[in-house]
């Protein structure tokens, strides 16, 4: 059994920081070089429902994790695999919700440059967080995690 220092995924950065940093950078570029990409009415009609769905998914994720009695931190040991709630549909509901929220905010701000940078956050999260988490979970839970991984998609 690994000690507590070894019993974690080794994520490169906290995912909320990855998303927030990328979004803020995109919004700052857009402030310097203003570029809208949608009519305001369409931006609102797309952005608000997407923001609502992202926040609801994030809340469902948090409730499920707390109810299951494990952690959502990539820097703490995971006690068991959670397969209920949003984890029945995606292995990464928190990161999916962060992607939805980022997209919604960038859309509501009508910030073209934030949308252009959007792929950076999920890509960095996948390479620097998700792939490390998956390796950690495979090592810690073996066949149980591999079976779950075979049944449920990484994103959607």
List each model region and its residues.
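Solvent-exposed interhelical
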Residues: 87
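Extended, alpha-helix-rich binding/interface surfaces that flank or overlap catalytic cores
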Residues: 92
